[in-house]
A protein has these predicted regions:
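Amphipathic alpha-helical and helix-coil boundary elements used as assembly
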Residues: 1-394
Length: 394
């Protein structure tokens, strides 16, 4: 027998939506990336997410349904798409594999589920192996490693020469840990890009994800922030036609500022070496050098030693000066560049930045009546939308 609260909740939902919950004209939507039907009609209530350079993205989506017993296994491994309405009326999409699905409770005929989305690259963290790769550079090694994961799309934007190594050793570590170690050793970074409406479908068809990982080096030109590379420093108002950053502040840290490396090569009876000293303004700090001579046959010649020492120094310099901000910018993307305008402290020529990480928070624009019902039936408090950002100008 239904309780009075169940009947009241069902009546309210029917009055607001009819038979099914609707995603029509919502700020946030959720759907299957491959056009397969979800188990039941779902409405995205809210989501939080983080995407960063050299990091797996992660999104948690709270979704509502009139069904209280959805089969959670039907979500696992499914690629889902979140879209967020932009100021110009277009939609920005993120695609991720559902790696965790949970039922959070139900009351009054309305159930809440939480879906955790990650990139297909997260699958590499689930396989552990020991393996020897011979006579390969990093690009060839990565291609061989990812060949075992047809879901993972990848591309390279690398101009620097990559040394062919006689042996790469994966030892009792996951494929993801090994991949990250190889990339770090070569000074390569990575970011994710998501297919948007109108993009050509992936060549691999439905077997491949609708997001891809891009491996890039320090010489690569970062793409502009989606929707335009100019962002305003301005108060956030509901009547504005574009989003804005309303908090932006610099921070500096003490860090090592020099690198010295060498690597013994018994075939040449010598140790190719290199040194690098930062050219950044580090205040009154003395030279603080990191020396690394641990690896054998790491560099065939001084040119490769110089290149390796440069990327090591660039990694140290990244922490020298960064910026953090917040606002209501719905199009921020990690690994993309932008120009900040209307800020008194950053004039033209000194206002270009690269986004290192961004945290998203958004809640759907549900009707006031349903918002009150959710607060009453499930104890939710009202929350706004915000974005936390981190940038670098180096």
């Amino acid at each position: 027998m239904n309780s009075p609260s169940d009947l009241a909740g069902a009546s309210l939902i029917d009055a607001l939506f009819g038979v099914k919950l609707s995603q029509h004209a919502r700020l946030i939507t959720i759907a299957s990336s491959q056009d397969s039907a979800l188990p039941q009609a779902l409405v995205a209530e809210r989501f939080t997410g983080r995407e960063a350079v050299n990091e797996l993205f992660s999104f948690d989506v709270d979704a509502l349904s009139t069904s209280t017993d959805l089969d959670l296994t039907s979500f696992i491994g499914e690629e889902l798409t979140i879209t967020l309405l932009q100021p110009d009326g277009s939609r920005r999409a993120w695609h991720g594999l559902c790696t965790d699905a949970a039922w959070l409770g139900a009351d009054g005929g309305l159930a809440r589920y939480r879906l955790h989305l990650q990139p297909a690259l997260a699958l590499l963290g689930l396989r552990r192996d020991s393996y020897i790769f011979q006579d390969k550079d990093a690009r060839d090694l990565i291609g061989e490693l990812l060949a075992d994961y047809p879901q993972v799309r990848h591309s390279f934007d690398v101009a620097q020469a990559l040394a062919v190594r006689p042996i790469w050793t994966q030892y009792r570590e996951s494929d993801l840990e090994f991949l990250q170690r190889v990339l770090a050793a070569e000074g390569l970074s990575w970011r994710f890009e998501h297919d948007q409406e109108g993009d050509e479908p992936a060549e691999g068809g439905a077997a491949q994800a609708r997001h891809r990982i891009v491996f890039f080096d320090s010489q690569a030109a970062l793409p502009a922030t989606p929707g335009g590379d100019t962002l305003r420093f301005h108060g956030v108002r509901a009547s504005d036609t574009d989003d804005a950053i309303d908090r932006f502040a610099a921070q500096r840290r003490v860090a090592a500022n020099a690198v010295s490396i060498s690597s013994w090569d018994p075939a040449q009876l010598m140790a190719p070496s290199a040194e690098q000293l930062t050219s950044l303004d580090i205040g009154e700090m003395p030279s603080l050098s990191i020396y690394d001579g641990s690896a054998e046959r790491r560099h065939d010649n001084k040119a490769f030693a110089d290149a390796h020492s440069r990327v090591m120094l660039q990694a140290l310099e990244l922490d020298n000066k960064q910026f953090e901000g917040a606002g209501a910018v719905r199009r921020m993307a990690a690994g993309h560049g932008f120009t900040l305008t209307q800020h008194d402290s950053y004039a033209d020529g000194d206002n270009s930045f690269k986004t290192l990480w961004v945290e998203h928070e958004a809640r759907n624009n549900l009707e006031p009546a349903l918002g009150e019902a959710l607060s009453r039936l499930t104890g939710l408090a009202e929350a706004g939308a915000a974005t936390l950002l981190q940038f670098s100008d180096e």
